[in-house]
Amino acid sequence: MRSDAIKKGHLKAPNRSLLRACGLKDEDFDKPFIGVANSYIDIIPGHYFLNDYAKIIKDEIRKNGCVPFEFNTIGIDDGIAMGHEGMLYSLPSREIIANSIETVMNAHQLDALICIPNCDKITPGMLMGALRVNVPTIFVSGGPMASGVTKKGEKISLSSVFEAVGAYEAKKISEEEFKDIECSACPSGGSCSGMFTANSMNTLCEAMGIALEGNGTILALSKEREELLRKAARRICEIALDERFKIRNIITQKAVRNAMIVDMAMGGSSNTVLHMLAISREAGVALDIKDLNFISSKVAHIAKIAPSLNSVYMDDIHKAGGVSAVMAEISSRQGHILELDALTITGESLEERLKNAKIKDENIIRKVDNAYSKVGGLAILFGNLAEQGCVIKTAGIIGERKFKGKAVCFNSQDEAIKGIIKGKVQKGNVCVIRYEGPKGGPGMQEMLSPTSLLMGMGLGADVALITDGRFSGATRGLSIGHISPEAAEGGLIGLLKDGDEIEIDVDAYTIHANLSEKEITQRKKEFVLPQKEVPSRWLRMYQKLVSNASKGAVLDME
């Protein structure tokens, strides 16, 4: 056992003495030691109950002949960190989470790992850390919350509250309606109820085979979710010493491809591109941002979920057959594009896992021949504005897929929010928010507040927004993020001026500023990088090491 390094032989008597202080007995030193990586924190609705979930898991591990050791990572709620300097810390927290998993698991030489993530950066951070450790690993998330319901009987989610801010600013809803939306949107614990970043990543864990069926869709705080926890705990005990189930044997090139196929079919958050690039790097497998359009061109978009379709939420997907039903439909109808021989954590191939899966409600999960779109729900655009690519959630587009407009430029998200409220962005404009990339922010803030303001003010179908920052999974509209190279590293987005004409063609995968090479060259000569004070030592360190979004915004020592 790997854990023999801390428990076997007379030289390890001091180690055992310390372990005995934690309650271990002689017989425990012959059992596998399993790390239980929790992410319990009171301030996140998807995490405040995870201490109870960890107890269920630890009890089941003990019943099955292993010794659990719980430890915790940090967690940030992007919704609570939104709209102030706290959002600068969201993406960097992914690196802290990954580092903490690696540090604890390797410092104590634990044999296997079960991770309990749920929201935002916690799932990708845990995946990255687990891949560095490379022991048998299983993921079981806390689960999504139920959708909210207003007094009028309308189903809503957190994105509805963000959009209500814009509607209230524009005097389109009353104060009473505004308060009702605020108080109704998040009715219970769990990750936010739509296909936002948390649920997208927990769904992709299922698609990659590192989590059991239902991981992405079974509601939090349900008996069914508790049974999933027990199943996961039993399974980690079964495979704790089996090298076939080391995480790098599960998250392979095939698994990463399967994840991106499911992402396209379900219209996942644009953040998944950022995270999967980082995860694939830790797994040692190739994923180039340029490959994603090819995958998208081969995969129909068959499940549209809030915020793209406000009548469908994660619990609806679960009742309609779940992620497995989506994968089974794609597999049977689209030329076996899925890698069906990929190994899953149960020991089954993906093909075996899907053999009994079927769509139970075709109004929720559509057949391929009745798909929302013949291509996937994400796209990568290229052009002189994004030579290394940028990302758009095509599933969330509500207006035209071709757009030409005059730039209205802002050098920060805060500046953009103030400008939008003052009416500086009008119908037909392209709202440009720059110096918000991984280096420029630093930290690559989410632009949910500006996009939600535009949507709530009735401009969502008539304005494009482009940024070197990123978007919440709750964003919809013609919102293009992750522009690389970013403004802070000399990208063309930093050279734009108010009134410059920008052309976007989603179906042609292009984004272009109509500027001559002569004009661009002249602007580069005149360009002076704006200086931004970064008081945080951690963020300054992050700024120096982080790559741009086209590489996953990873800390790069090379």
Swiss-Prot record:
Question: What does the cofactor field's note say?
Answer: Binds 1 [2Fe-2S] cluster per subunit. This cluster acts as a Lewis acid cofactor.
Positions bearing N6-carboxylysine: K121
Which residues does the record give as [2Fe-2S] cluster binding sites? C119, C192
Keyword Amino-acid biosynthesis set for record = yes
Annotated pathway:
Amino-acid biosynthesis; L-isoleucine biosynthesis; L-isoleucine from 2-oxobutanoate: step 3/4; Amino-acid biosynthesis; L-valine biosynthesis; L-valine from pyruvate: step 3/4
Q: Which residues bind Mg(2+)?
A: D78, D120, K121, E446
Q: Keywords in alphabetical order, please.
A: 2Fe-2S, Amino-acid biosynthesis, Branched-chain amino acid biosynthesis, Iron, Iron-sulfur, Lyase, Magnesium, Metal-binding
Q: Active site: which residues?
A: S472
What the entry lists under InterPro entries is as follows: Dihydro-acid_dehy_C, DihydroxyA_deHydtase, DiOHA_6PGluconate_deHydtase_CS, ILV_EDD_C, ILV_EDD_N, IlvD/EDD_N
The molecular function terms in GO held by this entry are: 2 iron, 2 sulfur cluster binding; dihydroxy-acid dehydratase activity; magnesium ion binding
What is one term from the GO cellular component aspect held by the record? Answer: cytosol
Q: Secretion signal: which residues?
A: none
What Pfam families does this protein map onto? ILV_EDD_C, ILVD_EDD_N
Name the cofactor(s) required for activity, per the record: [2Fe-2S] cluster; Mg(2+)
Which reactions is this enzyme annotated as catalysing? (2R)-2,3-dihydroxy-3-methylbutanoate = 3-methyl-2-oxobutanoate + H2O; (2R,3R)-2,3-dihydroxy-3-methylpentanoate = (S)-3-methyl-2-oxopentanoate + H2O
Q: Is Magnesium one of the keywords UniProt gives this record?
A: yes
Task: Report the transmembrane regions from the record.
Answer: none
E.C. number: 4.2.1.9
Question: A Gene Ontology biological process annotation?
Answer: L-valine biosynthetic process
Family membership noted in the UniProt record = Belongs to the IlvD/Edd family.
Classification via HAMAP family: IlvD
Quaternary structure (record): Homodimer.
Could you tell me which PANTHER family the record lists for this protein?
Answer: D-XYLONATE DEHYDRATASE (PTHR43661), D-XYLONATE DEHYDRATASE YAGF-RELATED (PTHR43661:SF3)
What's the stated role of this polypeptide? Functions in the biosynthesis of branched-chain amino acids. Catalyzes the dehydration of (2R,3R)-2,3-dihydroxy-3-methylpentanoate (2,3-dihydroxy-3-methylvalerate) into 2-oxo-3-methylpentanoate (2-oxo-3-methylvalerate) and of (2R)-2,3-dihydroxy-3-methylbutanoate (2,3-dihydroxyisovalerate) into 2-oxo-3-methylbutanoate (2-oxoisovalerate), the penultimate precursor to L-isoleucine and L-valine, respectively.
This protein is called what? Dihydroxy-acid dehydratase
Task: Please state the gene responsible for encoding this protein.
Answer: ilvD
